[in-house]
Amino acid sequence: MKKSLVLIISIITFLSFSCVNVNSKKMTIDTKKDKNLYEKKISVFPMENVEISNDVIKIFPQKENTTYTISGYFNGQIVVMKKNTIIKLNNAFIENTSSRAAIKCEEKTEISAAKDSVNYVVSSGRGFFTNAALQSERDLVIGGSGTLFIRGYKCHGVEAEDVKIKGSGDIYIEGTKAGSAVTCDSFTVEEGKTFNCYLLNSKNGIKADEEMKIASGNFYIFNNDVALKTDDESENKIQEQCLLALAIS
């Protein structure tokens, strides 16, 4: 059953409009289908202030706002250690089969999908870790004009303090029924963004503990127990009213 609405979100004192489509059908990210199409060796440019071992890549630029372009296949963890670093994925397949985050950001980081590129960030494997495929201890910006698939087989797709989505690309995020596609303190989309964001097969599509401000973008929510969730009880009631007012088609 397909449900569509223009969702009115009022978190704290902020009112905004965004197009959100809710669908009960299942749509999943196939992380095996295209893996062999990627270069077997990871490429990071520039190589300054980059340390590569067997299963860990550490990126620690001297200056903020430094951009690193990553291409190819890597099984392990990329650790971003400097504030305001920009990671541009250009046909990259980053996975961690040791059940840890594929990309871990110790400071505020931007993850951007390059134009016309298709990229994967995947966390899987056995173990007791319940983290996310893309994880930040601080703020996280996700954007670009390419395609980005994020899948967390262990718990969440994306986890950060504050999450901001921007750009004009296609972003697919999948967690588990024990976690969220996106979990954070605050979730923000500014005006004028044209991206498509697909939130798939999780307990919560977006779980924002403190606030949610969505002013633009297109959201497609497939097979999540709760589409949008905040810990503010009054705002949960607003969201419930919006969902009850869906036009069923």
Specify the residue positions occupied by each region the protein language model found.
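A composition-driven surface/loop motif
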Residues: 19-249
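Sec-dependent N-terminal signal peptides of Gram-positive bacterial secreted proteins and lipoproteins
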Residues: 4-21
